[in-house]
Amino acid sequence: MKKLAWVFGKSSDFSSTLMSEFNKQGISTFGFGRDNVDYGDFDKFIDGKVVPDIIIINANIEEQIALVIDNKNFLDITLQKMSNMFFNYTPVFLFFTKLIKWLENSNKETTVCGISSSITAWPQQNKQFVMYAVLRSMMQQLVYSASSNVCNAFCVSPSGINATNTIDYAKRVAQLITDKTDLKLIDLTIEEEVVNLQR
């Protein structure tokens, strides 16, 4: 039986390339995005769905909503602005929380890969983007929480992605899935793990 992959964030070039790579490997692939998923209604989404073998989370809402806070504008950041940021993140985060718990209940051998950012390993290098790092870290923790005796869960950071390396990055993600990578954040640019929770 063919393996099944779900790719969330299908509109991005990287997601499209990943889906193409999966198809080449004989993996049935379904892409999900805002045009066919209501992130505010998990029950409607999951109704009648078969548990996939692979889940790719590439929603990338964090970049759109994260506040930029530096040593010049920090006094202008209000409680309302901070609340709005988390409020806008909540539907997507809750959706994926429920998805991970649904997987947990299925007890099926699955791999979860979060397309993320390595900024969570060194937030001090880009201090003004600390809220972006915080949001990315939230999703990374959720992905890692899926790890179990039947589920592998890891994140990759496709930093420096461009037209010349997208296919290579997609092939590497597919290989990491094949290798049953677990509890790691791997930066595809430097080809190294920057976080390893198995240590």
Q: Where are the regions that the model predicts?
A:
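Short, solvent-exposed loop/turn segments at secondary-structure junctions
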Residues: 14, 38, 120-124
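Conserved mid-core segment of classical short-chain dehydrogenase/reductases
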Residues: 39-43, 58-81
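C-terminal helical subdomain
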Residues: 151, 155-157, 161-199
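Rossmann-fold cofactor-recognition segment
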Residues: 30-44
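Catalytic loop of short-chain dehydrogenase/reductase
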Residues: 73-95, 104-105, 109-147, 159-162
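N-terminal Rossmann NAD(P)H-binding glycine-rich loop of SDR-like oxidoreductase domains
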Residues: 8-20
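Rossmann-fold scaffold of SDR-type NAD(P)-dependent oxidoreductases
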Residues: 8, 52-66, 87-88, 113-114, ...
